[in-house]
Swiss-Prot record:
PROSITE patterns: RAB. Induction: By ethylene. This is Ras-related protein RABE1c. The keyword Cell membrane applies. Keywords: Cell membrane, Golgi apparatus, GTP-binding, Lipoprotein, Membrane, Nucleotide-binding, Prenylation, Protein transport, Transport. One of its GO terms (molecular function) is GTP binding. NCBIfam families: small_GTP (TIGR00231). It is found in: Golgi apparatus membrane; Cell membrane. The gene is RABE1C. It comes from the Eukaryota. GO terms for cellular component: cytosol; Golgi membrane; plant-type vacuole; plasma membrane. It comes from Arabidopsis thaliana.
Amino acid sequence: MAAPPARARADYDYLIKLLLIGDSGVGKSCLLLRFSDGSFTTSFITTIGIDFKIRTIELDGKRIKLQIWDTAGQERFRTITTAYYRGAMGILLVYDVTDESSFNNIRNWIRNIEQHASDNVNKILVGNKADMDESKRAVPTAKGQALADEYGIKFFETSAKTNLNVEEVFFSIGRDIKQRLSDTDSRAEPATIKISQTDQAAGAGQATQKSACCGT
């Protein structure tokens, strides 16, 4: 008998794999640390390859285990990260509101998603470092919202430093994915959305990292 969707163990109802992608230095690791560990660091240590954290949350009476992968933003690592797109159920596209180039590159990251990820993967746009002084802001909130509207995805501005909207971002995409999985359960065999143990083992074997940081 096939196992229920992404729920191989009794301590959770769904296992959801998320990816954090975006240019180096936008604060991906800081967002991950803030959400998973409730911590924040000002040190800048570039993530090497891919690392992940796990946090279990409750949504609508269901226990959701979020497996959140922190990808390196540097171009030389992009061949590593493409292998992880296919298993992702949700992708957080992160840019730095004080760095316009990181915002402009979101379109490139979306093209990568369209090329490598599943067609039905959930996406959310995140403008990080919203705590910075307005004089340093390079990307207006309205511009971020307009880009999100163009692609039909949700948009949040966050601050890993002050914890602004960090919980809201992960809970929002988690809830959307849970709903999609629930809808799929009612229509078809769920094997296509289950992350196999083989896939997880392969991913773990490739992941190498240093201390998580504010840099990615």
